[in-house]
Amino acid sequence: MSDAATRTEGTSGGHSSSAVGLMVGAVGVCYGDIGTSPLYTLKEVFIGGYGVQANHDGVLGVLSLIFWSLIWVVSIKYVIFVLRADNQGEGGVMALSALARRAAAPFGRLQTFVVVAGLIGAALFYGDSMITPAISVLSAVEGLEIAFDGLEHWTVPLALIVLIGLFLIQKHGTARIGILFGPVMVLWFGALAALGVYGVIQQPEVLQAMNPVWAVRFFGSHPGIGVAILGATVLALTGAEALYADMGHFGRKPIARAWFLLVLPALVLNYFGQGATILSNAEAARNPFYLLAPGWALLPMVALSTLATVIASQAVISGAFSLTRQAIQLGYVPRMSIQHTSSHEQGQIYIGGVNWALMVGVVLLVLGFESSASLAAAYGVAVTGTMLITTLLMGVVIWRLWKWPLWLGVPFFCVMLAVDSLFFAANVPKVVQGGAFPVIAGIVIFILMSTWKRGRQLLVERLDEGSLPLPVFISSMRVQPPHRVQGTAIFLTARTDAVPHALLHNLLHNQVLHEQVVLLTVVNEDSPRVAPDRRFEVEAYGDGFFRVILHFGFMEEPDIPGALRLCHLNELDFSPMRTTYFLSRETVIPSRRIGMARWREGLFAFLLKNANGNLRYFNLPLNRVIELGTQVEI
């Protein structure tokens, strides 16, 4: 887990308030998405065109499916097992992909599969990040239609006002109001539980749904639509991946405790309470969540629902920022401008390009679907796809890293794979029913990420073709030494055994070398953080030439000047006013050489041209940087 989480948990033995604080924080950040699912899940099941009757057997069968889905997928798979697959405390599909890639290192094809699976999972997460705010806020605002007649036409405008306002404040950060997220969500889950108890008391027979026989009987009595219903019941599981993605903020134990002590009981009670309402009045299936509430509680629940959905949306947006930073560090996404919105919380970041892209996607979804019922058809494909990818990557971890015995690992993996495959298959028909949007968004993002990754590989390969081995270069400098000037020159290069092109261009045009020449390589590790004693490697070649390798984790800011200040060597001088950084800026020219399709080469050239340069990314001083350009055919 993260350092902060580790410290807090380490002292929680004597301070129960610390453990409670972490649990409340986890409720506010991790459980917003799954916590707002009761707003639309049962409504979609009964009015979504699946043909499920709102009668005794239908209600108990659906409730049983939801209950056991929560037990198996969330409780057993994610909370008990997946949360243990942390990458030095960090979670999420990117962190899991990096962990599985290390575990699969001896197997080239398996490693390639892990990389592709990780990219697909990340792409689907971005698609999910657009749908969650749209469907959550829409479903909350729709409660006004129950309270007041004639407000149907105001649902979309009100939802857009809330959502656009949420995206507009991202640049200013949410640290100040973030402290309220946990208490508000605790209040939300308390309200869910209270409403559920209110409904169950009126129809206690709904508690029979905890018997899995009702789920089995439902499939038997609905052979034509049984699997299709899973496409609707999976809405109750949306947000399960967020538990894993946000693990680095709180640690495994607070997230697990919050689930079993508060979130799971509240969700089960509320779903069962909604089922009781439908049993009492089949017409309540049109919006069982709000019709479960007594008349006096309707408007307060609309207000609380709106707050809860905004918090859930905020968590998803922050998750997209965090995932993007990880992807940038791992080399899957072009470098973007990352702003820190809090001086106290390192995880509070803002990425403008991601924020505006998400906002456009969310607005288009709201305008295109206009209601949570319509949007529910688009939900599920991205969610179940990400869940399936997580299971596949977990299979690699179980086999290669945890080294479970075959008699245990194979059956467990097969059961996880079968359940997730069933949910995914149930959602595939949604692609032609409105679910194409997250799929198309995922495909576009996958193409961008894979093109960037492959393009960077080709760029390095092309630069290597004309590179000069470092020992040969140093030997030639001894034979014909150029004029040396005072100071330190740092040349950034991806290769550790060749001369940077910027160094050759500088020597060719300026005919001089600095007293100290440092060839600097930055290595992004598959782990979230790097220990201080592993931050740098230094090798002296003599005649003022040095090789320095800096290591950064995918959750760290690659601050080169800051890291070099820790590099204490008597013979190296990194004084700011005596150090000059030389960078190479490549201009890519698409060609007919073997590598990528011409359109992908053109796309990569566009991405490279618009990506943030090394200067900002590595926090280099503006007045101490010289950029030298070069053209490269790929």
Curated annotation (Swiss-Prot):
Single GO cellular component term: plasma membrane
Catalytic activity: K(+)(in) + H(+)(in) = K(+)(out) + H(+)(out)
GO molecular function, one term: potassium ion transmembrane transporter activity
Annotated localization: Cell inner membrane
Transmembrane segments: 19-39, 62-82, 113-133, 150-170, 177-197, 225-245, 259-279, 291-311, 349-369, 379-399, 406-426, 431-451
Keywords: Cell inner membrane, Cell membrane, Ion transport, Membrane, Potassium, Potassium transport, Symport, Transmembrane, Transmembrane helix, Transport
Record bears the keyword Transport: yes
Major localization listed first in the record, in broad terms: membrane
Entry keyword annotation includes Cell inner membrane: yes
Membrane topology: Multi-pass membrane protein
A Pfam short name: K_trans
Family: Belongs to the HAK/KUP transporter (TC 2.A.72) family.
PANTHER family reported for this sequence: LOW AFFINITY POTASSIUM TRANSPORT SYSTEM PROTEIN KUP (PTHR30540:SF79), OSMOTIC STRESS POTASSIUM TRANSPORTER (PTHR30540)
Role noted for this protein: Transport of potassium into the cell. Likely operates as a K(+):H(+) symporter.
Protein name in UniProt: Probable potassium transport system protein Kup
Source species of the chain: Pseudomonas paraeruginosa (strain DSM 24068 / PA7) (Pseudomonas aeruginosa (strain PA7))
Gene: kup
